[in-house]
A protein has these predicted regions:
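Hydrophobic residues positioned within well-ordered beta-strands of beta-sheet architectures
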Residues: 21-23, 34-36, 47-49, 65-67, ...
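Acidic (Asp/Glu-rich), glycine- and aromatic
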Residues: 44-84, 158-161, 168
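Secondary-structure transition/turn motif
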Residues: 24-29, 52-57, 149-151
Length: 169
């Protein structure tokens, strides 16, 4: 829901040392308010995101709270490798794609399910596969990294593994 409505955004800090943006949204269909502070410090290559979610209802409400970062060309190619401290991979019970390399309902020790596939290696564009794989089994400080060997550059995230115990790959 929050990806399709405007956010209230303002710059909290804009100095040579740090830039901080605050973004807030109150959902329309459900009673929640999400606030984010996104900051970037001078000479650091990491963006920090701090979030708070408030239930505006007078009763407990269920929700799905997650993030959907994506990477693609020109960064993502067959020289990329996915590293993580998650220990368990799995697929959903229903197939997502005809070309997926995992049987539905498969659970395995990350990164290799024993079928000759190593999911830590990103397939090439011509691989003709689409896989919906989830990773869990994270410690309290969860992380993943996608490293492009050819370009010698990486992209990664770290988060509270207890608050967000699953990663969609």
């Amino acid at each position: 829901e929050i990806s399709s409505v405007p956010w209230d955004c303002r710059i909290l800090k804009d100095s040579e040392e740090e830039v901080v943006l605050k973004a807030c949204i109150t959902t329309l269909r459900s009673p929640f308010r999400l606030e984010k502070e996104i900051s970037l410090k001078r000479d650091e290559s990491a963006i920090t995101i701090r979030e708070s979610l408030t239930n505006l209802a007078k009763e407990p409400m269920e929700l799905m709270w997650g993030h959907h970062p994506t990477v693609g060309k020109p960064f993502l190619d067959s020289s990329c490798r996915i590293d993580t401290n998650g220990t368990v991979g799995f697929s959903m019970d229903q197939p997502d794609f005809e070309t997926q390399r995992l049987k539905p309902g498969t659970r395995f020790a990350w990164p290799a399910p024993g079928n000759g596939v190593d999911f830590s290696n990103v397939p090439g564009e011509d691989a003709d596969t689409a896989d919906m794989v989830y990773i869990t089994g994270f410690p309290e400080r969860a992380w993943y990294r996608v490293h492009n060997e050819t370009k010698n550059i990486s992209y990664g995230m770290s988060w509270d593994g207890k608050l967000f115990p699953y990663m969609w790959m």
